[in-house]
């Protein structure tokens, strides 16, 4: 009787666009398609390293709820646009960049002054629009990180580094925008009960889709390696810093605002009316609870369920110690 598990022998990569690809692997033993597909998908969404703007200082601006003479967008919209700029740092973990422009015209990511080892992947991305006599002068701090980090959860070891006018941003470091996987039937000789795993991935251009899949697989291998090294007895205890003991660790996707789910305006407004601001708030609600929300019907509920399912989440989940300390409940 055959006791060895099958391993994929065929790998096919299909380019679907500049930053999109479909990776297919086969054959897998029955059930392994979902086991590995879900693991890779969760790692791709939550654990990839990337770069993002984390702090901004704008000349003449004290806080984000300001406006700038001669600039059509208010500061909030400028910051939102800035979050859409895709950075790529080579051989460094952080950098402070300058953007200075005056006179009528559109300000794009191309106007950001960068050293030779900093790359802007989408230089045509619009940041602001200047009217005649308008001027925009800002300093942008870009850092390397992982996942999603809300600005209000960031901590500074040196309180003296805080200064008036410095705006801390929510940072989405992940270069992966969307991931989905499907499991199809595969056949090897007379066996027809096998799996074919198809992973479709879209990135922001800072990393290719193929490299993202490789990186996620490497993370999984490193995490699982410890199980292959068990020799009995106890593993060395992890001595966590006193400041972090007892603190719950949540999947970064749960700390993201529900706005990032890109729901219809009707659904988004209904959730905010119920004080549901974060994805972690949403998944703890049941279907019956949401249906009791004014103006939220079955169609909106189905939309919410589909969007959550695309991220490997469902309604009615339980989270211990939610919300985390310091999470802004707005």
From Swiss-Prot:
- Does this UniProt record's set of keywords contain Cytoplasm? no
Pfam families from the entry? RNA_pol_A_bac, RNA_pol_A_CTD, RNA_pol_L
Record-linked SUPFAM superfamilies? C-terminal domain of RNA polymerase alpha subunit, Insert subdomain of RNA polymerase alpha subunit, RBP11-like subunits of RNA polymerase
Q: What class of enzyme is it?
A: transferase
Region listing for Alpha N-terminal domain (alpha-NTD), in residue ranges = 1-231
Molecular function (GO) terms for this protein are: DNA binding; DNA-directed RNA polymerase activity; protein dimerization activity
* GO cellular component terms given for this protein: cytoplasm; DNA-directed RNA polymerase complex
User: What are the start and end residues of every segment in region (Alpha C-terminal domain (alpha-CTD))?
Assistant: 250-330
Which Enzyme Commission number(s) are listed?
Answer: 2.7.7.6
List the cysteine pairs that form cystine. none
Domain of life, per lineage? Bacteria
* Nucleotidyltransferase among keywords: yes
Identify the InterPro entries for this entry. Answer: DNA-dir_RNA_pol_insert, DNA-dir_RNA_pol_RpoA/D/Rpb3, DNA-dir_RpoA, RBP11-like, RNAP_asu_C, RNApol_insert_sf
Enumerate the Gene Ontology biological process terms.
DNA-templated transcription
The record's keywords, sorted A to Z, are: DNA-directed RNA polymerase, Nucleotidyltransferase, Transcription, Transferase
**Which family is this sequence assigned to?**
Belongs to the RNA polymerase alpha chain family.
Q: Which NCBIfam families match?
A: PRK05182.1-2 (NF003513), PRK05182.2-5 (NF003519), rpoA (TIGR02027)
Q: How does it assemble?
A: Homodimer. The RNAP catalytic core consists of 2 alpha, 1 beta, 1 beta' and 1 omega subunit. When a sigma factor is associated with the core the holoenzyme is formed, which can initiate transcription.
Q: What does this protein do?
A: DNA-dependent RNA polymerase catalyzes the transcription of DNA into RNA using the four ribonucleoside triphosphates as substrates.
Q: What protein am I looking at?
A: DNA-directed RNA polymerase subunit alpha
